[in-house]
A protein has these predicted regions:
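ABC family nucleotide-binding domain
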Residues: 6-222
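A short acidic, often aromatic-flanked loop/helix-cap motif at beta-alpha or helix-coil junctions
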Residues: 228
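Extreme N-terminus of proteins, especially the signal/transit-peptide cleavage junction
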Residues: 1-5
Length: 228
């Protein structure tokens, strides 16, 4: 494949506790995800999917292993090489969750714009970018709506816009369609594929949702912390 992987994990392991209480959540997990790919992390509850997603998202420390994001090594032998992981997340990684977690007292536009303002962008420019993203995700007609007035599918599209605000090339989604019916889940997955192709992004989705399995380019299955 001509592109370098946007996400490369090499022998990632994670354990919690020590001695008799030690739990090995991940064991020597290696995988690559390339631009324009939408991939799934599958497996039963407790298999390590969310743990791996949180390590890729620079939220959780690994016990050992290495990781490169967009060609740059950020984790080596279980040690972070970047002093400011918050800035790394803010500018390189977008997060989408099962429940959209939109701020209830901000309208759709301001929910998206807030991410940009936290990164230092001027309010007017942040709102303009938010409107552009909402239009791109076909929910621009609801830009002034409060979260309580949005349908589940609309709210998740606003959450996707928020994840895209800082133009990340790596997008991590944890059960993004679990609360949606088949039609709305399909719309969300179509939009994620559009983002992957047009933005040359790598999208990793943790899911148990069988109705979206056909949307993925690749599927990685974890069992007992190992890739099956």
């Amino acid at each position: 494949m001509a592109d370098h992987p946007l996400v490369r994990c090499e022998r990632i392991s994670k354990h919690f506790g020590e001695g008799e209480t030690r739990v090995d959540a991940l064991r020597d997990v290696s995988l690559d995800v390339y631009p324009r790919q939408v991939v799934a992390l599958l497996g039963p509850s407790g298999s390590g999917k969310t743990t791996l997603l949180n390590i890729i998202g620079c939220i959780l420390d690994a016990s050992s292993g290495s990781m490169a994001l967009d060609g740059e090594t950020v984790l080596s032998e279980g040690r972070w090489l970047k002093p400011n992981l918050r800035q790394l997340r803010l500018h390189n990684i977008g997060f989408i969750f099962q429940f959209h977690n939109l701020i209830p007292f901000l309208d759709a536009t301001d929910n998206v714009a807030l991410v940009l303002q936290l990164a230092g962008e001027e309010a007017g420019a942040a709102r303009a970018r938010a409107v552009e993203l909402l239009d791109y995700l076909e929910v621009g007609h609801r830009r002034n709506a409060m979260p309580a007035k949005l349908s589940g599918g609309e709210a998740q599209r606003v959450a996707i816009a928020r994840a895209l605000a800082n133009r990340p090339r790596i997008i991590l989604a944890d059960e993004p369609t679990a609360a949606l019916d088949s039609k709305r889940a399909g719309i969300v997955m179509d939009l994620l594929r559009k983002v992957a192709v047009e933005q040359e992004a790598a999208i990793i989705v943790v899911t148990h949702d069988e109705k979206i399995f056909d949307w993925f380019d690749r599927k990685f299955t974890l069992r007992d912390g190992r890739l099956a």
